[in-house]
Amino acid sequence: MEHRGTSPLLLALALLSALCWRARALPPRGAAFPAVPRLGNRLPFDAASESDRAHGSLKSESDILQNTLPENEKFYFDLSRIIDRNDRHADGIFTTVYSHLLAKLAVKRYLHSLIRKRVSSQDSPVKRHSDAVFTDNYSRFRKQMAVKKYLNSVLTGKRSQEELNPAKLADEAEILEPSFSENYDDVSVDELLSHLPLDL
C-alpha cells in the first residue's frame, strides 16, 4: 500500500517543482508593467542639436531596459544577467574541456598510427628473414638431390650428355673433392650421403 501512495506523492512533488520553476521567471504579483506610450501620451523630448544626435553615444539595449524598469523589478533583471553570465561561463568551461579532450584523442590516434606503422615495418624484416631461411634450406635440399643424383649416375655408370658438360663437372668436382677419396667402387650412395655435411 505504501508503494501506491508514494507514486502520486512523487508526481505531485514533480508538478509543484515544475510550477515553482516556471513561476520564478514571472514578475512579482503586485508589480505593474511600465506604461507603454500611446499615441496621445508623448514623451518629452529634450531638444538636442542635430550634431549631438549624430555623434551621440548609443546605449546598449540592456542599459536602456534597466533604466526603464521600476526599482522592484531590477532584481530580476540582474538575476537574469547573472544566469546568462553563468551559462556563458559553463559553456566556456565545457568548450575548454571538450577541446582538451579532442586534442588528447588526436594525440592518441596519432601515437596509435605511429605504433601501427612501426609494427608493420618490423614485420617485413621478419618475413624477409623467414623467406631467406626457406630459400636457403630449399637451395641446400636441391643441391643434396643433385649430388645424390650425380653419385647414383657415377656409381651405376650411366651419365647423360648434360652431366658431361665440362663446366658443370668442374663445379661438381669442387663440391665433392674435400670429403671423398678417389676409389668409389665399393661405396654405396647411402654411405656417401652420410659423409656429406648436410645441415637442414
Curated annotation (Swiss-Prot):
Threonine amide PTM sites in chain numbering: 156
Coiled-coil portions: none
Leader sequence segment: 1-25
UniProt-annotated location(s): Secreted
The keyword Lyase is assigned to this record: no
Propeptide: 26-87, 119-126, 160-200
GO cellular component, one term: extracellular region
SMART domains noted in UniProt: GLUCA (SM00070)
Function: PHM-27 is a bioactive form from proteolysis of the same precursor protein, that causes vasodilation.
Protein name stated in the entry: VIP peptides
